[in-house]
Amino acid sequence: MAYLELKNVYKSYGTDENVTNVLSDINLTIEEGEFVAIVGFTGSGKTTLVNLINGLLKPTSGEVLFKGAPVVGTSHERGVIFQNYSLLPWLTVGQNVYMAVKEAFPKQSKAELKKRVNDYVEMVSLSPAINKRPKELSGGMRQRVAVARALAMNPEMIIMDEPLGALDALTRGNLQDEILNIWSKDKRTALLITNDVDEGIYMADRIIPLKPGPNATLGPEFKIDIERPRDKTAMNDNPNYKKTRNAIIEYLMDIGDQRKSVSQQEYILPEIAPKSFVA
């Protein structure tokens, strides 16, 4: 039994003649402890896919199964890290994390909850900022709060929806390493949504492209045959890295060209000759 499984999943919006088919015939299997990355173009339906897996949306048809049971709503078993930090601005770092753990562990004492908060804030190197509010933090620090909040709930699966996309290169690289360090400690199942092929290769066991929408579907998987822990500098000289990267980019370019060709056919404007208004 797969840990996470999507079977023939379709998702559309609208009714009757105004239906937009966002996702079409999505089939995905992720095993326990695996780190899988899905790469795709902006607007291809990646966030819709995340919301289906997390239970924020229901599929139009098909099944989303977590540990063999249908996903019928959100659960702290599946922790989500969004690109938008979604921190409550009137609460401190510690209070933002505390709200999450209080919801996830209602039977724990206040002391136990505070210890959990402190442990995870320390894990993302934010202990000196635990009493600061979001407006006092940089973008990278805010995203680390979001990481701490998601992980402090002790989810069995971590779902990341382009969590590092808005960060500068240095902060992004540091957070990639922090997420990998946390993941490697207990090998929680992880799903990363990204539009960065290099990020996917560095972090994941497998990369699966999502074709452009509408009617977006998953392409072939690419296994990352590079030993862990991975070194970004050394990877540049790794023949498996070069081969995998080239194959993924070539595939994405091909489907991108196909989509452009279809779009041009769909939106060819008629030739209209101007009327002469001269009597």
Task: Walk through the language-model features, giving the residues of each.
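The feature captures the beta-strand-to-loop junction immediately N-terminal to the Walker
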Residues: 39-41
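Helix-to-loop junction immediately C-terminal to a conserved catalytic motif
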Residues: 54
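Conserved ABC transporter NBD signature motif
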Residues: 62-73
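Short coil-to-helix segment of the ABC ATPase nucleotide-binding domain corresponding to the Q-loop/switch region
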Residues: 91-100
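Conserved ABC ATPase "signature" region
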Residues: 109-129, 181
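Conserved ABC ATPase signature
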Residues: 133-137, 141
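A short, proline-enriched helix->beta-strand linker immediately N-terminal to the Walker B motif
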Residues: 152-156
